[in-house]
């Protein structure tokens, strides 16, 4: 019985394509971005009476109050424009 030299080359080559940290929890592909659809504009907006109601236990924060629906409306009007080739 002749003994052949032991080689770890195949084992190393097999593991070459595994990225660092691949076996750590949460190391999968990042979540895909959902495309913005105009259905969000059709959502029921709260009336002014509902917006004025204070939440019990809420603290008054410094700075101006920002209307979230206003920001969402402006954001929905924005459109991605690809850069023109020069």
Curated annotation (Swiss-Prot):
High level of expression found in the heart and skeletal muscle, a very low expression in the lung and spleen and no expression found in the liver, kidney, fat and brain. Pfam families: Chisel. Residues 20-64 are annotated as: Disordered. InterPro entries: Chisel (IPR029268). One of its GO terms (cellular component) is muscle tendon junction. It comes from the Eukaryota. Belongs to the SMPX family. Plays a role in the regulatory network through which muscle cells coordinate their structural and functional states during growth, adaptation, and repair. This is Small muscular protein.
